[in-house]
Design a protein with these regions (language model features):
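Active-site pocket-lining/capping segments in soluble small-molecule metabolic enzymes
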Residues: 1-147, 154-272, 276-369
């Protein structure tokens, strides 16, 4: 059975939607965990405060209680790469952080997601609350799972999206995690990456060159104005890059609803569905697709369009520049998961390999979409 952690927008209707979907997919798939944070603690999280909900402690406590009564665990995100902007500022706020952790534990928060190991050190001085390592930390080696588990008692990891199609890494990581009672979680609908066309006309793409810089900006920007400065750096750059060619999107590290079985086959059944700043309508749309392992439509609608962050447009109303019929991608991931697999990070995209380009040319550009 597939299990899901879902982004929480703190809408009461989201809990109702989860309850209905859990009943609909009972025995096959279940949402078991929510994740999110609030604007008053923007210094701790990987999202600027203007994108986060604001609420008082009474509301938060009531929401956690309702979720807990439904059997949902709440995961509070303290996943800033550098909380408070520097090590010294972080140290200056150490007691404040620790007091907040103790309060979160008191009201029923089950787990905290971190991206900075120093946060684990602070938390472990006062609490044995469950911890998760964020995908922002980009765990790049199998042995890192062991280190974080043994040193800090961390029992859950969101896998680096760079590794989403690395069969050998995932197989070995899943083996270690399953043998040691650790949850290995895959971020399903993340399309981060950059792309271009070289001087010879070869289109290429790669894991996002802006990713760490992006999360530093998220963590330190305070207002929408700050986020939009310097041509909406960095998101303005990666958005335009991905739209350079249709096949750029195929080169990103997404996992379709239908592809989950490939991960099940190597021992992974826990998936993260992002979108905590999205609408309940959008989150319900995403949950239904993944829990049902079936999706009809444009692949790109599985990800919250970055453009909607600043425009306020509803996700499902957004007009994408590229249409990639999801069902045309059946079998697409076989290149990475059949036989010995394929590791894009070890090759020059567009030169050593043109698989995505050829696939797009054959199945996408010529489809009736």
């Amino acid at each position: 059975m597939n299990l899901y952690k879902v982004g929480c927008n703190f809408d009461w209707k989201l809990l109702d939607a989860i309850q209905e979907l859990n009943e609909k997919y009972k025995g096959k798939a279940q949402v078991v965990e929510l994740f999110g944070s609030d604007s008053d603690h923007e210094e701790l999280t990987a999202r600027p405060g203007w994108r986060l909900p604001k609420f008082d402690q009474n509301f938060f406590e009531a929401y956690i209680k309702k979720a807990k009564d439904m059997g949902l665990k709440f995961n509070y995100t303290m996943n800033s790469i550098q909380p408070y902007g520097s090590k010294m500022n972080m140290i200056a706020h150490k007691k404040e952080i620790q007091d907040y952790v103790k309060w979160l534990e008191e009201i029923g928060v089950y787990r905290i997601t971190i991206a900075n190991p120093m946060m684990a050190m602070f938390i472990r001085e006062v609490s044995n609350i469950e911890l998760e390592i964020s995908c922002i930390s980009h765990i790049d080696t199998v042995t890192q799972f062991k280190y974080f588990h043994e040193q800090f008692g961390i029992n859950k990891f969101c896998c680096s999206i760079l590794k989403n199609r690395n069969k050998e890494f995932l197989t070995r990581a899943a083996k270690y995690c399953n043998e040691h009672g650790i949850i290995l979680e895959m971020l399903a609908q993340e399309f981060c990456g950059v792309a271009g066309v070289d001087e010879n006309g070869n289109p290429y793409a790669t894991h996002c060159a802006f990713r760490d810089s992006c999360y530093l900006c998220h963590a330190t920007n305070r207002t929408k104005f700050e986020s939009m400065e310097y041509h909406n750096y960095p998101m303005g750059f990666c958005m335009s890059a991905r739209n350079s060619t249709p096949e750029s999107w195929l080169r990103m590290r997404w996992i379709r609803p239908e592809d989950q079985k490939l991960y099940n086959s190597i021992g992974i059944n826990y998936f993260k569905l992002s979108g905590r700043t999205g609408t309940t309508e959008y989150l319900t749309y995403i949950m239904d697709a993944y829990m049902g392992e079936n999706f009809e439509g444009n692949l790109l609608t599985l990800w919250k369009p970055l453009e909607t962050i600043t425009t306020g447009e509803k996700e499902l109303s957004h007009k994408h520049l590229v249409n990639i019929p999801n069902k045309k991608l059946d079998g697409f991931l076989d290149k990475w998961f059949k036989g010995d697999g394929w590791e894009c990070e070890n090759h020059m995209c567009g030169e050593d390999c043109k698989y995505c380009y050829e696939f797009t040319k054959k199945y996408i550009n010529n489809s009736d979409n």
